[in-house]
């Protein structure tokens, strides 16, 4: 695992999935299931768009952070790693 924050956060999410730590927001999302998490990704995406259009840059950063977090939870539920995404992005950059 690398030292970047995305990989670290993904590792924490996987740990929460494994331990089902009581009181964890990640665990609450996991318990609600993939459909709920996917809905949260949609909500956070909309909030990020709105923030980019009418709110401060800081608010936009906060909403993008929420979006990335929820995407990582959904990725974990789908058994997709950040490395899978990195590889796909690298493949696309070569085009």
From Swiss-Prot:
Pathway: Amino-acid biosynthesis; L-histidine biosynthesis; L-histidine from 5-phospho-alpha-D-ribose 1-diphosphate: step 2/9. SUPFAM superfamilies: all-alpha NTP pyrophosphatases. Its EC number is 3.6.1.31. The lineage of its organism: Archaea, Thermoproteota, Thermoprotei, Sulfolobales, Sulfolobaceae. CDD domains: NTP-PPase_HisIE_like (cd11534). This is Phosphoribosyl-ATP pyrophosphatase. Keywords: Amino-acid biosynthesis, ATP-binding, Cytoplasm, Histidine biosynthesis, Hydrolase, Nucleotide-binding. It catalyses: 1-(5-phospho-beta-D-ribosyl)-ATP + H2O = 1-(5-phospho-beta-D-ribosyl)-5'-AMP + diphosphate + H(+).
């Amino acid at each position: 695992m690398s030292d970047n924050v995305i990989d670290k956060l993904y590792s924490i999410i996987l740990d929460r999935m494994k331990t089902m730590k009581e009181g964890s927001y990640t665990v609450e999302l996991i318990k609600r299931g993939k459909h709920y998490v996917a809905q949260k990704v949609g909500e956070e995406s909309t909030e990020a768009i709105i923030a980019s259009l009418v709110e401060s840059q800081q608010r936009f950063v906060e909403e993008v952070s929420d979006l990335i977090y929820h995407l990582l939870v959904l990725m974990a539920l789908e058994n997709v790693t950040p490395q899978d995404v990195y590889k796909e992005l690298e493949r696309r950059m070569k085009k």
